[in-house]
Amino acid sequence: MSASDQHSQPSDNAPLPQSDATPEAPIDEQPAAPDGAALDAHLARAQYGRFLLTDAIRPGWRLDVVPRAGYRHDAFVDPAGGSRLPALVAAVSGETLFETFMALLDPLGDTCDVVLESTHDEAAGRREFTRSGIERLVLESILWDFEDLLLNDGCSGIAVMHPEQSLEVQFDEHKLLVVYAPIRAPFERILRGQGLDRDDRLRVISQGEHMHTSNGRHERRFGELAGRLGCC
């Protein structure tokens, strides 16, 4: 496991937007340095209320952010030109996370571009693998075969984009869903249809101390996914 407080950025031109939401207080005051048994119990905990985490990530011991479901409006601001691209940031409970991601691909159209992201090799840093012009139905069929990897590997992320328009859906290594779109309504309807409520004060797990997890099997499966997609 490795600790991180950085947002995932599967595509170069679309980093996860930053929220101005006021921080929430942790549910408990916890000591700064837990003993081994207490830390093991914390890492084994996969559910907070009704929110189910996947194996990919855990909140830090201090619970800076308590995981919960919902989505918020946000925006990516181009640091060079100052232009704004509307965004949605969603935290989805594990039992419906993958199907929600797949549903969000529908508004992207019949053909998509794909960026896979890997942080498996710490020495190599963040690596990206791209595929342009894949049929969305073919992409979806392949992704269903790798559901376990994309849900449970804390070192894998994917971004799916419209080849011409500013439309992008990210499923990042924090297992958050991020949508970039000039018109958010079609994607927002999908999120509401999945039972998610809008809360613009929502803080997500990547905004606090957290830990990612991966293993050799996931790394091998990531390579298989890149091969199936024809990424380079």
What spans do the regions from the language model cover?
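Structured alpha/beta or helical-core interaction and ligand-binding surfaces enriched in interleaved
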Residues: 2-176, 180-232
